[in-house]
Amino acid sequence: MALPGDPRRLCRLVQEGRLRDLQEELAVARGCRGPAGDTLLHCAARHGRQDILAYLVEAWSMDIEATNRDYKRPLHEAASMGHRDCVRYLLGRGAVVDSLKKADWTPLMMACTRKNLDVIQDLVEHGANPLLKNKDGWNSFHIASREGHPVILRYLLTVCPDAWKTESNIRRTPLHTAAMHGCLEAVQVLLERCHYEPDCRDNCGVTPFMDAIQCGHVSIAKLLLEQHKACSSAADSMGAQALHRAAVTGQDEAIRFLVCGLGIDVDVRAKSSQLTALHYAAKEGQTNTVQTLLSLGADINSTDERNRSVLHLACAGQHVACTRLLLQSGLKDSEDLTGTLAQQLTRSVDILQDFDHDVKS
């Protein structure tokens, strides 16, 4: 049996809302910190036990600004879990509204990871600053864009109209983030209320349209084309277009949309490497995507600037199924600029056997 004052037992009593049992335990031994450095206040706030929270503060004078090993305070816990009564109690007791946890997250940032407008409003009305950024350069609006709740985005823009004018440390905007995560309604709000450049780029030259395509969010890609005049053939810093990025991630529907719907050349090459979408798909072992590209007319014999065939990249990646498909589709082994055959790049017995079978047949 756990001894009185055992931190795990005390936390369990708080979690289960057993105030009377907790009072008896604390009369014997004042609570210790838990294994993560949590106080009982952290535990009460995390689990929404406002009555216990009040008891610990008022009867035991526990410090509402106590931090755990991640520098979280009870307000962080209550805000992140959406426990409005605990948030309001702590704010009413004078808790610091913009306290920082590890990685410089404020309670408002943590609240924006949940779709709980009331908690966000309470924090803002008590002075929380939506413009503060965490260590990655994200402010609360940016975090809310990832979650994609349009009501919260509209509220933050109402109380802080410039909240959208933000970039992360790698120059990604909330529009990039909402597009990548497939948050269609959020993207609609951002296009209606904010003023992002049509093809704003991050440090890698990636646009929101590319993000939408490479993650398979075709409806968002269409919206960006129609309402934001995005460029479907824009290239990133490596010269790769949306088609190439979709091939990497195996987004076949997006590839069909680009080629059949927008007329993008299925064999368009990345400027720096002269790789085609077929090369990118083979490099990643995206067998279904290789099949899709071939069905759309991709040139199976295309080579890059080093005269590497699609087979070279499939073999270098040790992709058995992809290599087999290419051989079955009629692609023959050939030398690159260094005189290396594709089969020389593989360690796979299965792939080498496929080459032997191809030669014999």
UniProtKB/Swiss-Prot annotation:
Disulfide bonds: none
PROSITE patterns in the cross-refs: ANK_REP_REGION, ANK_REPEAT
Membrane-spanning residues: none
Functional description taken from the UniProt entry: Required to prevent the misactivation of serine (Ser) with tRNA(Ala) by promoting the hydrolysis of Ser-mischarged tRNA(Ala), thereby playing a role in translational fidelity. Binds directly to the catalytic domain of AARS/AlaRS and captures Ser that is misactivated by AARS/AlaRS, preventing the charging of Ser adenylates to tRNA(Ala) and precluding Ser misincorporation in nascent peptides.
GO biological process: tRNA modification
Assembly and interaction partners: Interacts with AARS; the interaction is direct.
Keywords (A to Z) from UniProt: ANK repeat, Cytoplasm, Nucleus, Repeat
Start-end of each ANK repeat: 36-66, 70-99, 103-132, 136-165, 170-200, 204-233, 238-268, 273-302, 306-335
GO cellular component: cytoplasm; nucleus
Subcellular location: Cytoplasm; Nucleus
Record's protein name: Ankyrin repeat domain-containing protein 16
Record carries keyword Kinase: no
Annotated effect of mutating K135R: In ANKRD16(3XR); abolished ability to enhance hydrolysis of Ser-mischarged tRNA(Ala)
SMART domains with a match to the protein in the record: ANK (SM00248)
KO phenotype (gene knockout): No visible phenotype. Loss of Ankrd16 in mice with a 'sticky' phenotype (mice homozygous for the variant 'Glu-734' in Aars/AlaRS) results in early embryonic lethality. Conditional deletion in postnatal Purkinje cells in mice with a 'sticky' phenotype exacerbates the 'sticky' phenotype and causes widespread protein aggregation and neuron loss.
Phenotypic consequence of K165R: In ANKRD16(3XR); abolished ability to enhance hydrolysis of Ser-mischarged tRNA(Ala)
Gene name, Swiss-Prot/TrEMBL: Ankrd16
Tissue specificity note: Widely expressed in brain (at protein level).
PANTHER family linked: ANKYRIN REPEAT CONTAINING (PTHR24173), ANKYRIN REPEAT DOMAIN-CONTAINING PROTEIN 16 (PTHR24173:SF74)
Pfam families: Ank_2 (PF12796)
Annotated positions for site Required to capture Ser that is misactivated by AARS/AlaRS: K102, K135, K165
Alphabetized InterPro entries for the sequence: Ankyrin_rpt, Ankyrin_rpt-contain_sf
Domain comment, as recorded: Side chains of Lys-102, Lys-135 and Lys-165 capture Ser that is misactivated by AARS/AlaRS.
Claim: Repeat is one of the keywords in the record: yes
